[in-house]
């Protein structure tokens, strides 16, 4: 059984924290981070807003990310070993892949591969404050959040909803533990439902046939006597 779970949503919504907690709790679980597929800085264009376009889909090598997902699909065991994940014997038939990122549901070739799609949100002010407390390899220039980050988040979320992509929205203002328990329980229920669906139906007991009644055959009527025909 293979399960691909998306942990998506806005920047600084709590995606990485939730993903790391799930990674430790779920059996035979691997993770792919979308941030690992950013193109080199010299390939990031400057947009009409005057900022480097880090928060658009074109800033990511999504074909390479898709290839990595396909590698997991073709052999979860091999992928797990290559990434230092030990396959648990008691759950050797179950393999889970977590995809974590801010634009998981905007790349069509990936959208239909998810078994579950989660989307973390926090209010504007909270998101802006969290962003200001983070240290990035490439520091945010003044005005980036309001001039680029937030408008791009709104744009891609609106496109996702307009395209009818079904997601489970998560309140990023909840405690880490509460979010973790909520998602873990949902994933475990999905695994249980899938295992029940794939389990063979119990054999129905054979019906006991009465004397002279073979399966699918009617008992022949005795030939009518001459008296009966009169």
Curated annotation (Swiss-Prot):
Species per Swiss-Prot/TrEMBL record: Homo sapiens (Human)
Pathway of action: Cofactor biosynthesis; NAD(+) biosynthesis
Annotated tissue distribution: Predominantly expressed in skeletal muscle and, at a much lower level, in the heart (at protein level). No expression in brain, kidney, liver, lung, pancreas nor placenta.
Function: Catalyzes the phosphorylation of nicotinamide riboside (NR) and nicotinic acid riboside (NaR) to form nicotinamide mononucleotide (NMN) and nicotinic acid mononucleotide (NaMN). Reduces laminin matrix deposition and cell adhesion to laminin, but not to fibronectin. Involved in the regulation of PXN at the protein level and of PXN tyrosine phosphorylation. May play a role in the regulation of terminal myogenesis.
Catalyzed reactions per annotation: beta-nicotinamide D-riboside + ATP = beta-nicotinamide D-ribonucleotide + ADP + H(+); beta-D-ribosylnicotinate + ATP = nicotinate beta-D-ribonucleotide + ADP + H(+)
A GO CC term assigned to this protein in UniProt: nucleoplasm
InterPro entries listed in its UniProt record: P-loop_NTPase (IPR027417)
Amino-acid positions noted as binding Mg(2+) in the UniProt annotation, renumbered to this chain: 16, 35
A matching Pfam family: AAA_18
Protein's recorded name: Nicotinamide riboside kinase 2
